[in-house]
Amino acid sequence: MVKLTAELIEQAAQYTNAVRDRELDLRGYKIPVIENLGATLDQFDAIDFSDNEIRKLDGFPLLRRLKTLLVNNNRICRIGEGLDQALPCLTELILTNNSLVELGDLDPLASLKSLTYLSILRNPVTNKKHYRLYVIYKVPQVRVLDFQKVKLKERQEAEKMFKGKRGAQLAKDIARRSKTFNPGAGLPTDKKKGGPSAGDVEAIKNAIANASTLAEVERLKGLLQSGQIPGRERRSGPSDEGEEEIEDDTVTNGS
């Protein structure tokens, strides 16, 4: 493992990404703890912490400029309190493929008032009953959850389920937090699917090149790694009418 130092931050790749944001690339260093980010001097719109060994999402200084945080493929099992004090403008948070287990572990995200794009895919918590409605109720500012746009009907269902004394008790009952973390506990054990063909790989690469948000780029990279092809993902069902719906539930545009 590598300690995140001011020297590492200075040496890491820094560039203007596909959506014209200034990005700091800290992926793949096996960093265990987020620290020393004051050395960035708040000069970045996006920071990529993918493919590290981070267990807790905290340790941020005040970063007013930061809008996008990519933390997929880590070991995150806890989310620190008071993230809004450090990251007041965070709009995109990608936590795909981590170790979040309990619904209550997601509660600190409610403080991030600017958060509109959130991915918690491939975390054990997504298998919990009422997972999606719970997140929609607790973090109502999120417009896109797990690359699926939040529908008006879902907001109404979440409000109905968790409102009042009975709803508050239900939320309390299902929202216990993790007390301990056992490495590997609760993680999926499914066998990997076969890889895509050369033509499929090219199709995904083209889709990545045309992506309009970092979140969409990360989703497409995940498809490439898992052998899925854009346009062949399983649909969640027929679309219902509503002011927050789009024709295709899978979000491909950050607008």
UniProtKB/Swiss-Prot annotation:
Residues 123-161 form the LRRCT domain. The modification Phosphoserine is found at residues 178, 197, 236, 255. There is a cross-link at residues 172, 221 (Glycyl lysine isopeptide (Lys-Gly) (interchain with G-Cter in SUMO2)). One of its GO terms (cellular component) is U2-type precatalytic spliceosome. Pfam families: LRR_9. It is found in: Nucleus. The modification N6-acetyllysine is found at residue 172. It comes from the Eukaryota. LRR repeats lie at residues 20-41, 43-64, 65-86, 89-110. Identified in the spliceosome B complex. Identified in the spliceosome C complex. Found in a pre-mRNA splicing complex with SFRS4, SFRS5, SNRNP70, SNRPA1, SRRM1 and SRRM2. Found in a pre-mRNA exonic splicing enhancer (ESE) complex with SNRNP70, SNRPA1, SRRM1 and TRA2B. Contributes to the binding of stem loop IV of U2 snRNA with SNRPB2. This is U2 small nuclear ribonucleoprotein A'. The gene is Snrpa1.
